[in-house]
Amino acid sequence: MAGKGINIKVKRAAIIKALHDRLTEMVHIQEEYEREVEAYEKARLKWEEEVAQVTLKSIDFKTICDNINIRKGYSANNNQTNVMIDVMIDDNKLPVEPEGVKNPFRNTWSGKTYLGNYEERVAEIKNAITILNLSDEETVNTSTYANVAKYL
């Protein structure tokens, strides 16, 4: 019995409903993620402005020549010079950097199975729902269920 696989029948309607529910959940998760990314980008711009202000206030013009890097001709317009100044600032004088947002649907692997990004997963779920709706069978076999279960 150790080598014998399990064989069950799963109701097609139950799988379709579960896929619809998962699709709805994914849409809500993606919308929340997009709102969080937008808020993060605004916070990041504000943080960069604050860092620039602290940096400008921290420049010691007496010692600036020790920390200056001048490059000529590296820009698209060779009539410009790129001047970079390294300014050392204690971290405790800088504002706290906003934390990035983790993408809930980044490309990933689950064992040997590739799970794509949001768009790829939505397309796969919609495709599975379409195929399951075309079937007139009341149940589906274990292998069909296994193929769609990764999205549930």
Give short role names for the model-derived ranges.
Residues 14-19, 27, 41-43, 48, ...:
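Hydrophobic face of amphipathic alpha-helices
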Residues 1-38, 87-88, 94-97, 106-108:
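Short, charged, low-complexity amphipathic alpha-helix
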Residues 2-4, 145-152:
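Short acidic DE-rich linear segments
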Residues 68-70, 140-149:
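Extended, charge-rich alpha-helical interface modules
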Residues 49, 53, 57-133:
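Acidic, low-complexity, intrinsically disordered interaction modules
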Residues 16, 20-23, 27-30, 37, ...:
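Heptad-repeat amphipathic alpha-helical coiled-coil interaction surface used
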